[in-house]
Amino acid sequence: MVNKFTNLGFLIVITLILSQCANKGTTSGGDKDVTPPVIIKSTPENFSINFDAQEIEIEFDEYVKLKNLQKQLIISPPMTLEPEITPVGTASKIIKIKIFDTLQPNTTYAFNFGESIADNNEGNLFPYYKYIFSTGTYIDSLSVSGMVSDALNKEVDERVAVLLYEVDSSYYDSIVYKQKPKYITVTDSLSGFKLENLKEGSYLLTALKEENPNYTYQQKTDKIAYRKQFISVPSDTAYVLRLFKESIDYDFKRARQASKNKIAFGYEGEGTSMRIKILSEVPDDFSSTITKEIDKDTLNYWYRPEIEVDSLLFEVRHLESIDTAVVRIKDFKLDSLMFKPLSSKLKLQESLLISASTPLGKFKASKVQVMDKDSVFQTPTMGLDASLNAVVLDFDKTEKNNYSIQLLPGALTDFYGVENDTLNYKVATKLQSDYGNVRITIRNGVYPLIVQLTEAKGEEVESQMITEATPVDFKDVNPGIYSLRVIFDTNKNGVYDTGSFLNKTQPERVSYASKPVEIRAAWDTFEEFVLED
């Protein structure tokens, strides 16, 4: 009997232990912890003045971890020597900040941790915590706020850096390229910003969307926005900054032999003003032509006849800029003449373009035949598009038809006198009812205007310039949802012009209709866009 009671007691104890162990591991044994961590103390205290410490400790009531600190943490003013902040990759009850930089006198510093602090167990955020101190006798408390928009596109980049440069005796016009700002913040989810803990003074207000964040402007990769006039702090103004990508400054890079009788001239920026001249001695029958590579910042200089030399000397001009280039000449092969149609689906009023790998010289329409699916033949009209180095074929088309295009030998001749072999291509048209049309009426326009349909990311689909109050018709548009954009063409050149920080010019004004435009197949749509002042 005693043994039975002993065994029973042992089983009860074991059962209780196992039950407690099981409860510790269950996910249904109580409410989920949603309480964020709490700061117990900070050493030195937050909002300290006369700060001269080299290390800061922030102690929490539970273990915390730092997530995505490099992206989330904003230190304002920025430090030349980055501080060391722990824990990294592990959890701790204490966040430590070791300062290595020499702190500026009488300056308020702010460490904004964004959404980087979370408890270790449930990941509850301790959002937008700021540790603030002053090396002077008081904490600066002034602020500046506003919004950032994109000058051209409807959508605005996330986490745009907004910067203030103090305008004092050390300020200079190109400071944004070389020095970090006095104060920094980033835009919130609604593209708003607020720069806090500022001291009274005059400032340059800018914004940057950086490819590689370092708070200095890199023209090739970054977007910039700026306020043309300096701002004064304190200020009650809500500032609006329009972010834009500058046109890259022209820079000649290099010249190299790409193939026989072909020299490639690489550059950055605007290349339409480039002029290339050969300085080496050439024969009397020497001839040359230049084409631009599609989607590349390269001009190809083609010449004939072949010159038996070790090198060629060129002069490259661009407005007031003059460069010279020496190109070593090797025994390369001549480029083969090859062709590629730029589309296999054509609208009824659309031309067929066939691009060539070498410069086109002559064409013979009599050696080109077009046949539809009913074996009806026609001879197209032909032309050359120098910008694409392509032949342009125009012929009568009907809806829902297939066309076979044959170019017989000698239909096309390139710069070197090489003729095409027989070429065969097939293209097709769709039903007219597969497309939609839209008529757009602009109200309150200040002309000229460029009216555009764009896709979601701002890519241009249709575009038309108008110089007076007249409806804009976009016909045979693929069905879909589009945005309606109007560019105020201030300089009347028919294209959107971006801004320049150094030249102190802002990008041309752009307005988007508040509602998207839906293009439906076999449907005529009518839209009215009232422009605001």
Predicted regions located by residue number:
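Short, surface-exposed loop/turn motifs with a glycine/proline- and acidic-biased composition
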Residues: 478-479
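Charged regulatory segments coupled to nucleotide-binding catalytic modules in large multidomain enzymes
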Residues: 445-446
